[in-house]
């Protein structure tokens, strides 16, 4: 199966790597890492941005001269009302009409609140936002988010920043199978093999921050993740062989033995 070009909110993206802008050791490393990733979509917490003067913001000013699709997120919001307010502020400041809805109530797990996420997604979609909600790996919830207007859905592989990888590949596979909008795997991916697995399961892309920013060499890790996306996508398009319980010889042993005995 060949993936069609990735289109979200009417925008065609050449890169399937979405990358976060936080937690890098310094702005130089941040810039070089983003460059190595080839990412077009950058996400950042709105609460960390100077909304009065976004062009002078310490996070965004180092990205001058390059064109990105900004994906502000509502990290820090505890309910739908807060997320909606934050999204409106970001749009009013001219950042973007793309918004990553991120609502959690537990500082320990940072797991997304399903009810509040659904409410915020529906409300913001009605206001004309291009909404990409961060959610759990629940196939039913992911489908409901799509139905209320999500432009793409972003299920977590595991809790944010844990690096635990894909805890429930079955659910992720079902989410992809049932979706009519792009699925971007978000949170918990820790290595290039995690990324390749997500793409092999049929994901349309991945969003990463901690696994890259906190790596010993963020620039190299960004390149590794970029190549893993490409490898995983190629593997998905090529179609893996079915898994079986018992072995199958790659050579026709019966035919070879029969020919040898006749000789």
UniProtKB/Swiss-Prot annotation:
Reaction(s) this enzyme catalyzes, per UniProt: [ThiS sulfur-carrier protein]-C-terminal-Gly-aminoethanethioate + 2-iminoacetate + 1-deoxy-D-xylulose 5-phosphate = [ThiS sulfur-carrier protein]-C-terminal Gly-Gly + 2-[(2R,5Z)-2-carboxy-4-methylthiazol-5(2H)-ylidene]ethyl phosphate + 2 H2O + H(+)
EC main group: transferase
Keyword NADP among UniProt keywords: no
Protein name (Swiss-Prot/TrEMBL): Thiazole synthase
Quaternary structure and partners: Homotetramer. Forms heterodimers with either ThiH or ThiS.
Pfam families attached to this UniProt entry: ThiG (PF05690)
Main location group: cytoplasm
A Gene Ontology biological process term: thiamine diphosphate biosynthetic process
Metabolic or biological pathway: Cofactor biosynthesis; thiamine diphosphate biosynthesis
EC number assigned by the record: 2.8.1.10
Localization per record: Cytoplasm
């Amino acid at each position: 199966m060949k993936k069609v070009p990735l289109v979200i909110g009417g925008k065609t993206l050449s890169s399937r790597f979405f990358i976060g802008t936080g937690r890098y050791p310094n702005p130089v490393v941040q810039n070089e890492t983003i460059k190595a990733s080839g990412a077009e979509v950058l996400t950042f917490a709105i609460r960390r941005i100077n909304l009065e003067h976004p062009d002078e913001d310490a996070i965004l000013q180092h990205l001058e001269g390059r064109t990105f699709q900004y994906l502000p997120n509502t990290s820090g919001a505890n309910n739908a009302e807060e997320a909606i307010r934050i999204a409106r502020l970001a749009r009013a400041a001219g950042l973007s009409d793309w918004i990553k809805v991120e609502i959690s109530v537990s500082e320990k797990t940072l797991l997304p609140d399903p009810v509040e996420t659904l409410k915020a997604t529906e409300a913001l979609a009605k206001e004309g936002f291009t909404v990409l909600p961060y959610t759990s790996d629940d196939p039913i919830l992911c489908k409901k988010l799509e139905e209320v207007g999500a432009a793409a859905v972003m299920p977590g592989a595991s809790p944010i920043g844990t690096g635990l990888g894909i805890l429930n590949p079955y659910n992720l596979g079902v989410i992809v199978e049932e979706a009519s909008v792009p699925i971007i795997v978000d949170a918990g991916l820790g290595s290039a093999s995690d990324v390749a697995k997500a793409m092999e399961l049929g994901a349309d892309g991945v969003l990463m921050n901690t696994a890259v920013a906190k790596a010993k060499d963020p620039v190299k890790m960004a390149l590794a993740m970029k190549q893993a996306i490409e490898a995983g996508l190629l593997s998905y398009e090529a179609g893996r062989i079915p898994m079986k319980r018992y072995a199958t010889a790659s050579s026709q042993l019966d035919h070879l033995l029969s020919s040898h005995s006749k000789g």
